[in-house]
A protein has these predicted regions:
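Active-site lining segments of carbohydrate-active enzymes
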Residues: 1-10, 14-24, 34, 38-41
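Short coil/turn linkers that connect adjacent helices within long alpha-helical scaffolds
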Residues: 5-7, 24-28, 45, 64-69, ...
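Helix-turn-helix repeat elements of alpha-solenoid scaffolds
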Residues: 6-18, 48-58, 92-98
Length: 214
């Protein structure tokens, strides 16, 4: 866990493998769930997505055989959301992030905020910026609406609804520190920026029936 927090991902993997071998003889499903979840996060961090998915499946298998506390369930749902978003299945990812937000909120865990942020990100990636505002009027989400991490998503949704590359760039600049520290948001917004850029180019050339390239 400490190596993951310190971003020493490759050093963490052999230790996780060794720990899993020892835990399987003890048959402690709760700890197995935690370690497989950590394995999934570490593999995701080094972009080994097949192993990340396999580890998450193992974590869920272990969790399904015991009573899984809300906090652990929320962490599993968060990782599921992240992996579905990577696969561009933003609709399923948004559902997982909603479950995550509810789970963390039920135990007053601050990780409800990034869960909400990722759910809003999914709506933006689905080209549904208007849903960002309706979600933020909900009972749980409204508690976090003024948080700076959520303000980022509102600014991006606003830019997207206007198909404004200028507003999008302004939002990226205004919330630079929040965005640079979150690799998940940064990667998806980079793809969105490319899409907006393409839309803006198309909007410029739409009035012309014939274009001559120099």
């Amino acid at each position: 866990g400490q190596l993951y927090e310190a971003k020493a991902y490759r050093e963490a993997l052999p230790l996780i493998a060794q720990l899993l071998r020892e835990l399987k003889t003890l048959d402690d499903k709760m700890i197995l769930t935690e370690v497989h979840l950590l394995e999934s996060k570490v593999n995701h961090a080094i972009s080994n997505f097949p192993k990340s998915k396999a580890a998450l499946t193992s974590a869920r298998t272990s969790a399904n055989s015991i009573y899984c506390p809300p906090l652990m369930q929320a962490q599993l749902d968060m990782q599921s959301g992240v992996l579905h978003a990577d696969d561009k299945d933003f609709k399923t990812a948004a559902s997982y992030f909603y479950e995550t937000m509810e789970g963390f909120d039920s135990v007053d865990d601050a990780r409800a905020i990034p869960a909400l942020k990722y759910m809003l990100l999914c709506k933006i990636m689905l080209n549904q910026p208007e849903e960002v505002y309706s979600i933020l009027e909900g009972k749980i989400a409204s508690k976090y609406a003024k948080h700076r991490e959520i303000e980022v998503m509102k600014a991006v949704a606003e830019a997207q609804s206007h198909r404004s590359l200028e507003d999008f760039e302004r939002a990226l600049q205004q919330y630079k520190s929040e965005l640079s520290s979150d690799l998940i948001v940064r990667n998806h917004l980079s793809a969105l920026y490319d899409k907006l850029l393409e839309q803006n180019i198309l909007r410029v050339i739409e009035p012309y029936s014939r274009i001559e390239l120099a």
